[in-house]
Amino acid sequence: MKIYSVSDHAFKPYGKVLTGFDTAALVAAMKTIPMPESGTAYEPGIEVLEACGMFNEMRDRAYGGMPIQIGMCWGYNTKLNCLEYHRDSEVNVGETDFVLLLAKEDEIEDGMLDTAKVKAFRVPAGTAVEVYGTTLHYAPCQTTEAGFRVAVVLPKGTNTEKPVFEAKSEEDTWL
């Protein structure tokens, strides 16, 4: 699989690099969180990350003042094992370089995605990238044996417990 850079034109349909953010405090805060023994971990909101100086700027500049949460996905991953999407964009910032495996929601046909359509994009450490709401994504892939730590910024309440409701469409069952 070819690995593109998020600075390549090929990334444009999936997201964009956000400029003007000083991510140093967020990167330092991520380093304080221990790695899992194996696999990956995810928490939608982590106090030490939300307490760093970047929270208000991210809320205001990336989300127009909407309530946000800053959590993290971290651990060890080298493969495509799942894909998800949200109703809103997600911002990722890595403590080290990482790779995102991405596809487009509109490439789903009859509830299935041809994984040959998935593209890989390398994100440099400390770079803030917006992943559009229509982009399928999941746990990042590591670029070294040391694993990865990636901050995940989302609207408040995203990726928390699924609400109980009657599904009225196939997509409702995916939420």
Question: What is each PLM-predicted segment?
Answer:
Residues A125-A128, T134:
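Tight coil/turn sites that cap or link beta-strands
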Residues E130, Y138-A139:
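Alpha-helical transmembrane segments of helical membrane proteins, especially in multi-pass transport
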Residues M1-A125, A139-A146, A151-L175:
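Active-site region of the double-stranded beta-helix
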